Every structure is written in C-alpha cells, then in structure tokens.
Amino acid sequence: MGIAISINALNKTFRGGRKALHDIHLDIKAGEMVALIGASGSGKSTLLRHMAGLMAGDGAGQGLIQIHGQTVQQNGRIAADIRRTRAGVGFVFQQFNLVDRLPVIVNVLAGTLHRVPLWRSLLRWFTPSEVARGVEALRRVGIAECCAQRASTLSGGQQQRAAIARAMVQGARVILADEPIASLDPESSRKVMDILARVNREDQCTVVVSLHQVNVAIKYCPRTVALHQGRVVYDGPSVALTPTLLRELYGADADDILALGDHITSLQDNKPVAPHLVWPAALAARAPLASAA
C-alpha cells in the first residue's frame, strides 16, 4: 500500500513569533483512517490546512508536503499546480461551508467544478449524469430526499453530510475533515462518523479527521496522531490511548481532552488492546511516544 500523504520537516510560525507547528514528520498510507487529537490550539486545524495547501509553512526550513506523490508545498511555497492536486482532496470544514441560498444538490455538485468548463461552472449548469451522481452521493449519506431544499433548511448534521457528499462527487482520494462533529449532537455525530468510516472502507479513500473526542478516535480510527503545542507527541494505535497515557502526554492540558462527560466513559486504563483494531504492525512497532524536544 502506497503513501497517500507525506509530510517532512514542516514548521509554521505565525506573526509575533508564535510557533504553531514544530518539525512535523508524518506518513499516512493510502486507505488509512487517522485521527488527529489534541487540546484547543494544539495545531490540528493548522496541520490539516497545510495538507490541503490552504496555508504555507515556513520558508526557511525544508518543509515538504506531498499527496499521492504530487507536491502540495515545499520550502514555504504552494506548488504552482496545486489546483490539480486539490482536485483529489476533499476538505470537510467544521462550519459546513455550504451556500445557504442554493439547493443542496447544487452545493454537492460544486465538487465537479474542477472538471467542467468555466462557462458551465458560472451558469451552474450540470449534465444529467452529473446530477445523477450528486443524487447518488446524497443517497449514500442518507439525505437524498433533501436534494431540492435550500442548504439553509438542513440541520447541522445534514449539512455536514452534504459536505461529505460533495467530496464524494469530487472523486476525492483523500478527505481531510476538520472537527466535523464539534458542533453536532451525539446522534448526528455518530451518523457523520459512520459515513466517513464507510467512505474510507468502501471507496478506499484516505481519511484524516481532527477530533476533540478521544473515544470517537478510538471507535473509528485505528491510528491516532496526537499534537501538543504544535508537536507530534504520539503516533500509534488508537486503542492504546488511556486516561493515564493522555495525562502523561498532555499534563495539565489533558483536562481539555478528558473533560468530555460521558464521551470519555469508554476509556479505561486497563482496557486490553483488541488485535483486530491495532494499527498496522509494521508501523505500530515504532515507539508511540515521539520526542517533544
């Protein structure tokens, strides 16, 4: 299985000298479903935006990001052909990023715009086969009956499912989801995560999802990458994450991750690692604690 996302020596410093990402090295295999966890401000969203080429890293270092072998950015410069690379990357935002006044189907078919002529994209004119593909994507996420409604009439969970359908219509080989369930109720959260897991499994689509709920990472993602103050402090099997380990990794900041009420009840310090859920053995053999130096 090849590498879908490769990140080497990525650093990001914001104005004022605040270091957001510290020397990130990360390889994600094609077809993996990986969780990014961390307290607020740990760098999860910043890292995802760099993966998508929406932000550029520091130019002074040797930072390099590639998706399926295509360069997204290098040495602080976004690749000149980034549009071609982005065509295979779906980004699911926390705030849905739909156009409220447009019908759901039109929002979903925005995923085809990179493949259609400019005049058709300006007129929002789609072929019957494109519309059929959009309706099928909406059926797969369970909201086909809403295709003619304005996006503004959907609930938060339905809007997030429409955003995933847009990535499916796009034909994305990689989906980057930035806290897609942060503002949703538990039932809507479950449906959204079930859909992401199904797309990962059925379409062999690589999924990287940032989460604030550790138990959700354990349930859906065999592998978890934990960030703390812009550094990777854990990269390994999700099932190995216990409250004790999280406190070791995060110290006082662990309260931000553990203070989730019922969300954390599935975490037990003596919970055995289920072999069928373990992250691939060749990678799991690596020491789970990354250097924070």
UniProtKB/Swiss-Prot annotation:
Please provide, in alphabetical order, the Gene Ontology terms of the cellular component aspect for this entry: plasma membrane
Query: Where does the ABC transporter domain start and stop, copy by copy?
Result: 5-254
Q: What class does this enzyme belong to in the EC scheme?
A: translocase
Q: Which reaction does it catalyse?
A: phosphonate(out) + ATP + H2O = phosphonate(in) + ADP + phosphate + H(+)
Q: Which GO MF terms are attached to this record?
A: ABC-type phosphonate transporter activity; ATP binding; ATP hydrolysis activity
Q: Where in the cell is it found?
A: Cell inner membrane
TM stretches of this protein: none
Q: Which UniProt keywords apply?
A: ATP-binding, Cell inner membrane, Cell membrane, Membrane, Nucleotide-binding, Phosphonate transport, Translocase, Transport
Which interval of the chain is the signal sequence? Answer: none
- Which CDD domains does the UniProt entry name for this protein? ABC_PhnC_transporter
- Residues holding ATP: 38-45
The UniProt entry, under Pfam families, shows: ABC_tran
Q: Does the keyword Kinase apply?
A: no
Q: Report the PANTHER family cross-referenced here.
A: AMINO ACID IMPORT ATP-BINDING PROTEIN (PTHR43166), PHOSPHONATES IMPORT ATP-BINDING PROTEIN PHNC (PTHR43166:SF6)
The name on file for this protein is: Phosphonates import ATP-binding protein PhnC 1
Taxonomy, top ranks, is: Bacteria, Pseudomonadati, Pseudomonadota, Betaproteobacteria, Burkholderiales
UniProt gene name: phnC1
